[in-house]
Regions:
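Amphipathic C-terminal alpha-helical segment
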Residues: 97, 141, 145, 165-182, ...
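Helix-turn-helix
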Residues: 11, 15-61
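N-terminal intrinsically disordered/low-complexity leader segments
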Residues: 1-7, 201-204
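Hydrophobic alpha-helical connector segments
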Residues: 57, 71-106, 157-164
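Hydrophobic alpha-helical segments that form the core
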Residues: 106-112, 138, 155-174, 190-194
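Short helix-capping/turn signature of helix-turn-helix
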Residues: 48, 112-120
Length: 204
């Protein structure tokens, strides 16, 4: 283990993320986190000043990973020459990885955090807005380029970009409520076909 204890910190965050997603922040006690992480209170307070501090760090890490996933999808589709086809390929990038996404987690941390008034008031909502803004800009830029290249008029690009983000969140809820991870792939497939139709490009 590194001398700075970074592996121990990540183990605590990993345990807390799973517990908060599964049970909610209020129902996840510090003792629950310590048991799941296999660590002590001393180790916990070496890295976090409080349970609320842990929640902020957890959200910050999740947001960073979320934006990294966005950037990875943009990079992976950067060589698609047709802007409209790139929009479709962008969604397909996640659709093809839907099973992997759902095997890693059963729901989204954003939902668990935003339903807790204490966390929202403590600034975690601002962290989440950072991710939402990044997704909106990234997707809106793709849509604008596609509309310009195709001579199309999209009524509200920002709202359409938000719809892409909302589809992910809604799919998480649908998977969680039904107990079936298959809904993530299905919903992304529907989104891909709708965007393809709007942009006048093949959905495949």
């Amino acid at each position: 283990m590194p001398k700075d204890g970074s592996l121990n910190r990540e183990r605590i965050l990993d345990a807390a993320e799973k517990l908060v997603i599964e049970n909610g922040y209020a129902a996840t006690s510090l003792d629950h986190v310590l048991r799941a992480a296999g660590t002590s209170k001393g180790a916990f307070f070496h890295h976090f000043g409080s349970k609320l501090d842990l929640a902020r760090a957890l959200t910050d890490r999740y947001v960073t990973a979320d934006i990294t996933n966005l950037d990875a999808a943009l990079d992976a589709t950067a060589d698609v020459a047709d802007p409209a086809a790139r929009v479709v390929a962008f969604v397909r990038h996640f659709e093809d990885r839907a099973d992997e996404i759902m095997s890693g987690q059963s729901s989204c941390l954003y939902v668990a955090v935003l339903t807790e008034r204490q966390l929202a008031d403590a600034g975690t909502a601002d962290l989440i807005n950072t991710a939402i803004t990044a997704w909106r800009k990234g997707i809106a830029d793709l849509l604008t380029e596609a509309a310009t290249a195709g001579g199309l008029e999209l009524e509200d690009v920002d709202a359409l970009a938000d719809h892409v983000f909302v589809t992910f969140e809604g799919a998480f809820l649908l998977c969680r409520s039904t107990g079936s991870p298959a809904h993530m792939r299905a919903q992304l497939g529907v989104l891909r076909r709708l965007l393809a139709a709007a942009l006048g490009v093949a959905a495949a």
